[in-house]
Amino acid sequence: MQDASRADAFQIRRRQFLHSGALLLTAAANIRCGATEADPTVRLRIGLITDLHYADKDTVGSRHYRETLTKIAEASTELKKLSPAFMVELGDLIDRADTVSTELSWLKKINQSFSAICDEQHYVLGNHCVDTLTKQEFLGAVGQKQAWYSFDRQDVHFVILDSCFRSDGTAYQRKNFEWTDANIPAEELEWLKSDLQQNKLPTIVFAHQRLDVADNHGVRNNADVRKILQESGNVRAVFQGHSHQNDLHEISGISYCTLAAMVEGTGPAANGYSSLEILSDGSMRLQGFRRQQSRSFS
């Protein structure tokens, strides 16, 4: 009887252990969407976040502005574990405010959290970033010199684009624009063409307004932009935000990947952020968290 009691007790403890382990695995799976163990062939890892829309104001529709602080805290914890080489914020870091001082205060608060994830950050301007602020005010506050530029890391070329211009070439600022009138001006197009002609490395482009659609979320002259990207022969993918939903199109061999907005929805499960891994064989893997879908790019 004593041996039977010991056996029963062992089985109970075993079931309790297995149940606890299953709960832990389930909790971890709920944070990462399609996540895998870090691959030893990863040569560069980049953190991506878009459409945070932080603001100290009440919820409007599905946009829970104040919850962004909690969501970015989780993103910071998870992404720090992966040690990204740099972070890219794909636009709309803040939401609109009535005054310059209010927008700057919101920007300072959210950027403290974003810039703490790793040592290097890059910011794509979104229409909400310069709703009240000028571009110089926003860029000065986050410590970035230019709105569009390029740089190289680990034999990969990266391009940051700025589509916050009206059709007449006027830069967004001080509520002087309609959000549906997004354009890349001639000067920037000329720079982009020259930059890509001089570059022979595989290239990734970061944008806010979409370069792959003709609806209100698209850059009005995005066909001109795509032509330049295609003719370069080196552009692998474009990562963008603005429409707040997961989406993916391939046009002429270039992947246009739209990322989920962090601001949408309430609670931990409504978060969205990702890690882009560039592998030694030239392929790429987007590891999505929460609402962000994971993707593979050959």
Language model: regions and residue ranges:
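Short acidic, glycine-rich surface-loop motifs adjacent to enzyme active sites
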Residues: I94, L196-A214
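N-terminal export leaders
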Residues: I12-N30
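Active-site neighborhood of phospho(di)ester-bond hydrolases with catalytic His/Asp-centered motifs
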Residues: I49-T50, M87-G91, Q121-N127, I204-A207, ...
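N-terminal active-site segment of His-dependent metallophosphoesterases
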Residues: G34-E103, S194
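Extended active-site neighborhood of metal-dependent phosphoesterases/phosphodiesterases
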Residues: D98-K193, Q197-Q198, D224-N234, L248-Q287
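N-terminal secretory signal peptides
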Residues: M1-I12
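Catalytic metal-binding/acid-base residues of hydrolase active sites
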Residues: H53, L93-I94, H128-V130, C164, ...
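Short, solvent-exposed aromatic-acidic interface loops
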Residues: Q287-F297
